[in-house]
């Protein structure tokens, strides 16, 4: 039996169907679509206490709580969301949504294309962060939420929070941008391309139309996840957890798994290939690559952020080399140059990029203090 005392408890996903086409940055348009989402807590009378949680690459709408009493795995940010937690559901109404192109209930490549009666597959349009934010705004309209008390996201989710503040300035009171960046570096784009190539060159990928073939490009997904997972960890963190430990205690002088880190990465790859969609992985990494709000302003990030009205909290982690503190400081400097209100914290952690999902005490304390301020502003 799952202990839900400090949790939002048993939750259920909801679906919102939209019949109006969604124009996309690519020039394409997505016809009728569905967004899957979850909510926790209660919306107050003036609907001022709503918080939107934006997920990262492999995330989804199931942010907190459990689906069944015997469920062993809570939502991916359950350590932050719930009664008495930093994002306190006794004070806030929290919304988590699976982005379009995802594989957890919202319309994506594995969904049926109404024009063909077959899965979208390779025909599903490329999505961008602005496309997601537009769809999230439509969901907010559906829920009757005119203004978010806060939009919060880590990594790719932080990019969405940043874009919310630019695209809908009057609808965001606070934007929390965690372990993120205003655009990807060349190195990060390179990592994403290698991961995509692992999938694209898997014979079972079938050009993205593997659903009809009854295959799953597991080899490509495994390799993509293994590569990605390495970049989410830090050298010190990996050394502390695995070092050079051998599974059998001695060298076997072969090419099978010998080191514990090899076993761990293969386990992560195998697990990921069991539930994640290959086309979704491609879409999510491309959305990361394309995000660059400063591009439309001649590379001037401060100019891109000028429309924002929100107060910002930007946080980074010392051991995160995928989205380094330098990238967060770049955002902070641009916000200051644009005359915005911004708080910045660089948190000591050995957990690398994944630290935004962890519970390092300084991080928890930071989130609790900032969200307490947000709650007081809306009398929550």
UniProtKB/Swiss-Prot annotation:
Listed EC numbers: 2.3.1.46
Pathway noted in the entry: Amino-acid biosynthesis; L-methionine biosynthesis via de novo pathway; O-succinyl-L-homoserine from L-homoserine: step 1/1
Active site: 155, 320, 353
Gene Ontology CC annotations of this record: cytoplasm
Enzyme class: transferase
Keyword Kinase among record annotations: no
Subcellular location: Cytoplasm
A molecular function (GO) term: homoserine O-acetyltransferase activity
Chief site of localization: cytoplasm
Example GO BP: methionine biosynthetic process
Residue ranges constituting the AB hydrolase-1 domain according to the UniProt record: 49-357
Keyword entries, A-Z: Acyltransferase, Amino-acid biosynthesis, Cytoplasm, Methionine biosynthesis, Transferase
Residues annotated to bind substrate: 225, 354
Site (Important for acyl-CoA specificity): 322
InterPro entries referenced in this protein's UniProt entry, alphabetically: AB_hydrolase_1, AB_hydrolase_fold, HAT_MetX-like
Swiss-Prot/TrEMBL catalytic activity: L-homoserine + succinyl-CoA = O-succinyl-L-homoserine + CoA
Annotated function: Transfers a succinyl group from succinyl-CoA to L-homoserine, forming succinyl-L-homoserine.
HAMAP family per record: MetX_acyltransf
Family: Belongs to the AB hydrolase superfamily. MetX family.
Binding partners and assembly: Homodimer.
Name listed for the protein in its UniProt record: Homoserine O-succinyltransferase
Organism of origin: Chromobacterium violaceum (strain ATCC 12472 / DSM 30191 / JCM 1249 / CCUG 213 / NBRC 12614 / NCIMB 9131 / NCTC 9757 / MK)
């Amino acid at each position: 039996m799952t202990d839900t005392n400090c949790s939002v408890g048993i939750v259920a996903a909801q679906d919102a169907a939209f019949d109006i086409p969604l124009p996309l940055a690519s020039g394409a348009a997505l016809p009728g679509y569905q967004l899957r989402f979850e909510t926790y807590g209660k919306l107050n009378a003036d609907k001022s206490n709503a918080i939107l949680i934006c997920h990262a690459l492999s995330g989804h709408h199931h942010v907190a709580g459990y689906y069944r009493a015997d469920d062993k795995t809570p939502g991916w940010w359950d350590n932050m969301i719930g009664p008495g937690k930093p994002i306190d559901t006794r004070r806030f109404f929290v919304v988590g949504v699976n982005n379009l192109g995802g594989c957890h209930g919202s319309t994506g490549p594995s969904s049926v294309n109404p024009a063909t009666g077959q899965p979208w597959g390779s025909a599903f349009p490329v999505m961008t962060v602005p496309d997601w934010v537009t769809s999230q705004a439509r969901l907010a309209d559906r829920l009757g939420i005119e203004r978010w008390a806060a939009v919060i996201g880590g990594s790719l989710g932080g990019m969405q929070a940043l874009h919310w503040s630019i695209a809908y300035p009057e609808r965001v009171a606070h934007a929390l941008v965690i372990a993120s960046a205003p655009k990807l570096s060349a190195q990060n784009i390179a990592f994403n391309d290698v991961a995509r190539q692992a999938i694209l060159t898997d014979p079972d990928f079938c050009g993205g139309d593997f659903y009809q073939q009854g295959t799953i490009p597991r080899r490509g997904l495994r390799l993509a996840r293994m590569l990605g997972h390495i970049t989410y960890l830090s050298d010190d963190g990996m050394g502390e957890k695995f070092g050079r430990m051998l599974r059998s205690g001695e060298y076997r002088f072969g090419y099978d798994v010998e080191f514990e880190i090899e076993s761990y990465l293969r386990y992560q790859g195998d697990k990921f290939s069991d539930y994640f969609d290959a086309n979704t992985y491609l879409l999510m990494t491309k959305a990361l690559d394309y995000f660059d709000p400063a591009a439309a302003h001649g590379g001037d990030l401060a100019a891109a952020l000028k429309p924002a009205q929100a107060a910002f909290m930007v946080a980074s982690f010392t051991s995160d080399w995928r989205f380094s503190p330098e990238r967060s400081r770049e955002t902070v400097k641009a916000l200051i140059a644009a005359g915005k209100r911004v708080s910045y914290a660089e948190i000591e952690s050995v957990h690398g990029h994944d630290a935004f999902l962890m519970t390092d005490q300084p991080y928890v304390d930071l989130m609790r203090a900032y969200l307490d301020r947000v709650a007081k502003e809306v009398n929550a």
